[in-house]
Every structure is written in structure tokens, then in C-alpha cells.
Regions:
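Alpha-helical scaffold segments in soluble metabolic enzymes
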Residues: 15, 19, 99, 129, ...
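Positively charged, low-complexity intrinsically disordered leader regions
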Residues: 1-52, 56
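Secondary-structure boundary motif
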Residues: 29, 132, 160-164
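Residue-level detector of alpha-helix boundaries and kinks
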Residues: 2-5, 85, 139, 177
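Phosphate/diphosphate ligand-binding glycine-rich loop within oxidoreductases
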Residues: 34-40, 48-159
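Glycine-rich phosphate/diphosphate-binding loop of Rossmann-like nucleotide-binding domains
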Residues: 44-66, 159-197
Length: 197
């Protein structure tokens, strides 16, 4: 597996859940696995739990983390091809991904849907451009359409706490006055199908 951008990137999801539970129960078992390796964490949107849990997991594996908050630090990136860069973008993703790949052994990205243009959001512009132009694996920390790390964590919780082989699982989506991203719900539904719950 080169990238972990979607649940489908895991060849055996149930096995991955079992391995994750075993690792959770012995979180420092592989504490030297990432020695002399770096995880670049790129945030185009804020994060609390995903950011902390990913940094802690990296630390437990012996990885160093390098964090960039792209809306507050660094240059605004351009994602379109053939565009004259004389506006607010000072760096093209093609060059940025190549540079970050030189310093990091993996790149984790969090880039929400804009909720302005569904077609553009569904194209996963940020995630797919980094996957295209980087030379290292990409990890999705939540994108416009998917949040595989959250779905993996949800699968762990279900497996650890279920009292029957097929527990009743309900996903509730409440009305909200403003548009909300659907990445978590999308990945949750796919995960439930994969664990046959």
C-alpha cells in the first residue's frame, strides 16, 4: 500500500482493525519502527482530535512530526495547471509536494470540502494533487469526501464494545443551518459495510 487515502486502500480491513487493536493494547511495541523518519502533517483546516491522535501515534512509532498550517503559515498553494501565478498563490502544489517529499517520509493531509462547488470538492483537488506530485505515501486525515482514520477508529470502538456479532448501529445526521462536510458519514457507512455490522 503506497497511500492511505480511502478505506479501500486497506487490502484487508478486518485484519487492519485487529492489528490496530493489538497495537493500541501495546502502543510502544514498534517504538523504533519510525526511527530517523519524519511524518509531514499538512493542515489546510483546523483539527484537534485527529491532529493530536496522529501526532501521538507517530511519536509511539518513533517518528518525528513536522506540522504546517497552510492557512496560517507558508505560502498559499495553487492547484490549477497552466495558471499564471500572479495572484494570491505563491507556490504551486507540484513544487511544494516535491519539496515536502524531500524532507518527509510520509505526508498526512487534512483538507475539508469548500462546500462552494460540489464537483470540485468531489474531485479531491488537494489530496489528489499531493498524491500525484509527491514521491512519498499520502495519508488522509480528512478530505472533502473521506475520513479513513476516523472510520478506522470507529471500527475499533465497535469491535471493542459490541455485545453481538451484528450490533445495531445507527448513523444520525441532523439538520444544520449551514452546509456541513460529509466525509465522516461517508467513511462511517463504508466502514460498517466492511465489518459487516
Amino acid at each position: 500500500m503506497k497511500d492511505f487515502m480511502y478505506l479501500e486502500d486497506l487490502p484487508n480491513f478486518k485484519k487492519s482493525v485487529s492489528e490496530a487493536i493489538a497495537l493500541k493494547n501495546n502502543s510502544l511495541k514498534f517504538n523504533s519502527l519510525g526511527q530517523n523518519k519524519a511524518l509531514g502533517m499538512l493542515f489546510f483546516n483546523p483539527s484537534l482530535r485527529t491532529r493530536l491522535s496522529t501526532q501521538k501515534a507517530a511519536q509511539n512509532l518513533g517518528l518525528k512530526t513536522m506540522v504546517m498550517n497552510f492557512n496560517d503559515e507558508g505560502w498559499k498553494l495553487e492547484f490549477g495547471n497552466g495558471i499564471e501565478m500572479n495572484g494570491t498563490s505563491s507556490e504551486h502544489v507540484k513544487e511544494a509536494a516535491a519539496v515536502i517529499s524531500q524532507y518527509c517520509d510520509m505526508i498526512a493531509i487534512r483538507a475539508f470540502a469548500s462546500l462552494n462547488d460540489k464537483k470540485t470538492d468531489e474531485s479531491e483537488l488537494v489530496l489528489n494533487n499531493f498524491a500525484r506530485y509527491s514521491s512519498v505515501p499520502i495519508i488522509n486525515m480528512e478530505s472533502a469526501t473521506a475520513h479513513p482514520l476516523q472510520a478506522l477508529a470507529d471500527a475499533i470502538t465497535i469491535k471493542e464494545h459490541k455485545t453481538s456479532d451484528r450490533p445495531k448501529i445507527v448513523l444520525t445526521w441532523a439538520p444544520h443551518p449551514k452546509p456541513l462536510p460529509h466525509a465522516v458519514a461517508n467513511s462511517f457507512i463504508k466502514m460498517v459495510k466492511k465489518i459487516n455490522a
